[in-house]
């Protein structure tokens, strides 16, 4: 079910479009759109319905494929750069904390060391974490991504 509806003129005026060729492109697109918007209207109405239960849908796929993880990490790096300039600071911290949760979730579920060019964002996640529980997880990840993964999956 989709709950996002955008004015075409707004998207064009701000140069907003989906990144082509990546999975989970909405995870990168939606935050950029919301940060550009001067006004957002929330509604409980279904705007449109799409079938994500079809065979091969990434929404319901078991586990994480290498491509899914690579695309997610690329998205998270892109969002980290965007979030660096967000004001006010409280909003920036909340966005970074959410990004930390997404990154740590990905690192817990997939052994990222096998990815070409992978560099664990150990200190970045520690800087981004806000809540005590998330800071503890980020600290463990910073000390040892392998131990973090074992603890999270035990």
PLM feature segments, named:
Residues 71-74, 91-99, 129-143:
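Short secondary-structure transition/capping segments
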Residues 16, 37, 58-59, 72-76, ...:
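Gram-positive cell-envelope targeting signals
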């Amino acid at each position: 079910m989709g709950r996002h509806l955008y004015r075409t003129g707004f998207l064009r005026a701000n140069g907003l479009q989906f990144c082509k060729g990546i999975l989970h492109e909405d995870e990168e697109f939606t935050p950029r759109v919301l940060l550009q918007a001067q006004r957002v209207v929330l509604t409980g109405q279904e705007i449109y319905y799409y079938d994500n239960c079809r065979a091969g849908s990434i929404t319901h796929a078991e586990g994480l494929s290498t491509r899914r993880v690579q695309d997610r990490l690329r998205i998270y790096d892109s969002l980290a750069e965007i979030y660096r300039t967000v004001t006010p600071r409280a909003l920036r911290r909340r966005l970074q904390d959410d990004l930390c949760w997404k990154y740590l979730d990905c690192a817990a579920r997939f052994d990222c060391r096998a990815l070409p060019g992978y560099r664990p964002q150990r200190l970045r996640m520690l800087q981004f974490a806000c809540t005590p529980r998330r800071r503890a997880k980020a600290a463990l990840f910073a000390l040892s991504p392998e131990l973090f993964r074992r603890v999270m999956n035990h």
